[in-house]
Regions:
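Amphipathic alpha-helical dimerization/protein-protein interaction segment
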Residues: 42-84, 133-137
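Hydrophobic/aromatic-lined pockets within catalytic cores
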Residues: 11, 15, 76, 117-118, ...
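Internal amphipathic alpha-helical repeat/solenoid segments
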Residues: 73-102, 123, 147-148
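Long, well-ordered hydrophobic secondary-structure segments characteristic of membrane-embedded
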Residues: 95, 100-113, 130
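Helix-terminus loop motifs that line ligand-binding clefts
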Residues: 122-150
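Well-ordered alpha-helical scaffold segments within catalytic/enzyme domains
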Residues: 47-59, 108-121
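C-terminal segment of N-terminal export signals and the immediately downstream linker at the start
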Residues: 1, 20-54
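N-terminal export signals
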Residues: 5-27
Length: 150
């Protein structure tokens, strides 16, 4: 092999190795939950916790199972501000990197939980609170698409 071919092949090999994440080369990975502790979660749902347990038994790939466990409940764990205002549920969902709620995105973020609302009264109230909040926002400014909580 001549020097030019050697350098070309070596460069390609090094380039290929740099595109492979180091963790993918490690065989014995531990998939530890990255969810916040229960006391730090912004909202909890027994139906969501049950579906996570159920789905994890069906997913054979340990990493995909871990991803599902961490990603599916993320909206509830980290972005929900639920309270009662004048005796009615009110749900504000942070939908981006600032503490604001986009109407379209807040709807999209609760969409995966809709099949579970018949099983969990807390989820029903969360969705009702979101509808109440979105109604207030639209009445405040029908042309805006994002709102702060205040």
């Amino acid at each position: 092999m001549n020097r030019k071919t050697f350098l070309k092949n070596s460069s390609l090999a090094v380039g290929a190795l740099t595109t492979i994440p180091l963790q993918s080369l490690i065989k014995n990975k531990e998939f530890i939950s990255k969810r916040p502790p229960v006391y730090e979660r912004t909202f909890t749902s027994s139906a969501v916790e049950e579906i996570i347990k159920k789905i994890k038994t069906v997913i054979k790939d340990e990493e995909v199972s871990w991803l599902f466990e961490n990603c599916y409940p993320n909206t509830l764990d980290t972005t929900v501000d639920f309270e009662y205002i004048d005796g009615k549920p009110d749900t504000f969902i942070i939908t981006g990197d600032i503490d604001a709620m986009w109407l379209r995105d807040s709807t999209a973020q609760v969409w995966p939980y809709l099949p579970l609302i018949n099983e969990d009264e807390k989820l029903q109230k969360l969705v009702k609170g979101l509808i109440n909040r979105q109604t207030k926002c639209i009445l405040l400014d029908p042309y805006a698409n994002a709102f702060y909580k205040d």
